[in-house]
Amino acid sequence: MSRKKLTDIMICGFALFAIFFGAGNLIFPPYLGVISGSNWGIANIAFLLSDPLLPILGVIVTALLGGQATDLGKRVSKHFSIIIGAISIILIGPLFAVPRTGATTHEIFVQSFVPTAPQWITSLIFFGLTLYIAIHSHTVIDAIGKYLTPILLIILLLVFIAAVVQPNAGFQTTTSAGLFSQSFKEGYQTMDALGAALMAGVVISDLTRRGYTEKKEQYQMMFGVGIVSFILLALVYSSLTYAGATVSTVYDSTVQRPALLIELIEQLLGSFGKVAMGIAVSFACLTTSVGLITTCGHYFSTLTNGKLEYKKIVVVSVVLSFLLSLLGVDALLQLAVPVLSAIYPMVIALIFLSIFDRYIVYNWTYTGAVVGAFFIGGIQAIHLFSQMQGGNFLAELATWTNTLPLHQFGFEWLVPSIIGSVVFTVISKFTGMGSKRV
């Protein structure tokens, strides 16, 4: 491999790392470390499979399919790809991810120094800035982002070193039962896999700009870029999981994730580290918020051929994000669980099938896989929503899903997805229903 290719792979790999390295994601690994204690390695591996492996695979396969946001689900149907794309954008936009950036800023930074400060004031300022920048000036965010990522990485490196050199307490002895599944599904909360299809176009455009115009060459570069990004993200998340495990005798599963992160930083790096981390995370959350809001605006404006104006979409998205942020981080995470339980299995099935897309003849192979995955995910989602309302709807079916193979790993939907894929393939082959690969 030439020096130029290696350099470009490193640059693009760091760029993809920066895209997925959202400050809001930092709250998850330390919490996993706390609940896993002595078994933090199992929790860490499960989380890394969910994020960053899935999102990076999503970027790579979408690039292989054509690089458009709607390519991932297009072999199910054009309408399905649009719907799943729109749902993903809404979830990583004004429904969950963006409100969480505002709530995280309040709980990690503002509340740490002014405990009595009301959430609505923080959110009003935060989303006021988001609205202004999203409409008027992206250069501010570019400038902030240029310096924020290195600062955050330096702080996190110091956290890991401090955790290794002077652990605060020790590892709580825990059971590994159900830990892999819980940790894997904790990775759903980052929602990075939902935005992976959008990121593929960004990477492809960057590679094209650098002179890699041949498809085969782009694919080779994409694999290298993905590996670099994965290694960087894995190092960051693993460090935080380990740091969380070192205080697993101090905290338990009831600790709030943002509070845990900032308290961990203070214990390991002192007051200066706490202030530096709070400021860095707040600005990083702002850049994430602006980026996701503008992406949402452009996506729906393009999807409707300009019938929905970019500015109007941005305003509505920001207002909705402001209102939902008032619920707080933990409430937003709880609300997201049922929705992600329904959506994520379908996305994972699409990503893995797309790896072998060139060998899959029948489009119904994809349809069957999605139907099987959604059947299980849908049952669990409805049951979880019911439990949140004090009910127990579909309890027997939900209990049945827990008896399915691979449930202990969080893949109880996999066998039904495979069965659905095989059945739909056979039907398509012998009846001629559905389309074939062109």
Predicted features along the sequence, with ranges:
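Hydrophobic transmembrane alpha-helices that form the core helical bundles
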Residues: 31, 79-114, 282-302
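A generic transmembrane alpha-helix motif of multi-pass inner-membrane proteins
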Residues: 159, 166, 179, 363-438
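TM-loop-TM module centered on a large, flexible mid-protein loop between adjacent transmembrane helices
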Residues: 69-74, 236-286, 293, 338-340
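Membrane-interface loop-to-helix entry segments
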Residues: 135-163, 336-348, 368-376
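Hydrophobic, membrane-embedded alpha-helices of multi-pass small-molecule transporters
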Residues: 11-21, 162-167, 176-243, 276-288, ...
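Membrane-water interface regions at transmembrane-helix termini and the short interhelical loops
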Residues: 64-72, 127-148, 209-212, 322-335, ...
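Hydrophobic, small-residue-rich membrane helices and short re-entrant helix-turn-helix hairpins
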Residues: 136-147, 180-183, 203-232, 249-262, ...
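Hydrophobic alpha-helical segments and their helix-loop junctions in multi-pass secondary transporters
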Residues: 94, 98, 153-176, 193-196, ...
